[in-house]
Amino acid sequence: MTTNNFSHTSVLLDEAVNGLNIKPSGIYIDGTFGRGGHSRLILSQLGEQGRLIAIDRDPQAIAVANEIDDPRFSIIHGPFSNIEHYINELGLSGKVDGVLLDLGVSSPQLDDPERGFSFMRDGPLDMRMDPTTGQSAAQWLMNAEEDDITWVLKTFGEERFAKRIARAIVARNKTEEPLTRTKQLADLISEASPVKERHKHPATRSFQAIRIYINSELDEIEKALKGAVSILAPAGRLSVISFHSLEDRLVKRFIRDESKGPVVPAGIPLTEEQIKALGSARLSSIHKMKPTGVEVEENPRARSSVLRVAQRIEE
């Protein structure tokens, strides 16, 4: 597997790793290896007894990870939603000192036209995080009903012209050759959008929505968060970077819910043992951070990012 030459600047790099409160002999998980920015910084802070396990479902990321020659480091090819399974298989559940998740699409994925994520560069209409599995965006759009496309654009892109765009996509696929290129789709969306926002391409929300749907991103994140909390040691840290409001709302809600104890409706007689069986709070929120103005100026893609850090409650 060859790698591309597109560079990637990790957003909130120091802040996300600092949020893990690295112990030199600790065990850490980088659930989204990408191009290894966070992993390399974590390794630089680990001692000889420390261990870092990275996960990524992108074959290009795996190729980059395989170039790291360090006995403390290992890479797993697969979705981060399976984090609990991977760590259970390694016999490390409850022993992990920190999990880092950097959500969304990496710069190399966006910048490589062959991956089909960007409306700014023409390429195959793919959008899969792992191009070796699942259906591409083009395949889905070719067979999807207008109502299904409308729902995806509204739900995952908050696109106000979702119905117009969906109608245009279905009409195009029925009357002409199906959409197979990113530029074809971007141009179609532009034509179908009656109002253009300043400083934002008309296809921005639709491309985001289709990408999230094709990769089941929000479901993957929810499973990854649940798995991450389950494998953390007492006082272990969870450090999560999100890049748009849908991701951040999900992360915020998850940390909030995991910070509460069981809610017992008034008037229901339960013994202390029964209340304990309902479970207890597992996380405490540490802090929320956004990038500095300097970082946003140097890396505009950092603009909408949010870092949230939480800690596993010691039982």
Curated annotation (Swiss-Prot):
One of its GO terms (biological process) is rRNA base methylation. It catalyses: cytidine(1402) in 16S rRNA + S-adenosyl-L-methionine = N(4)-methylcytidine(1402) in 16S rRNA + S-adenosyl-L-homocysteine + H(+). Gene3D superfamilies: Putative methyltransferase TM0872, insert domain, Vaccinia Virus protein VP39. Its main location: cytoplasm. InterPro entries: RsmH, SAM-dep_MeTrfase_MraW_recog, SAM-dependent_MTases_sf. Keywords: Cytoplasm, Methyltransferase, rRNA processing, S-adenosyl-L-methionine, Transferase. Specifically methylates the N4 position of cytidine in position 1402 (C1402) of 16S rRNA. S-adenosyl-L-methionine binds at G36, G37, H38, D56, F80, D102, Q109. Its EC number is 2.1.1.199. One of its GO terms (cellular component) is cytoplasm. This is Ribosomal RNA small subunit methyltransferase H. GO terms for molecular function: rRNA (cytosine-N4-)-methyltransferase activity. The keyword Cell membrane does not apply. Belongs to the methyltransferase superfamily. RsmH family. It is an enzyme of class 2 (transferase). It is found in: Cytoplasm. Coiled coil: none annotated.
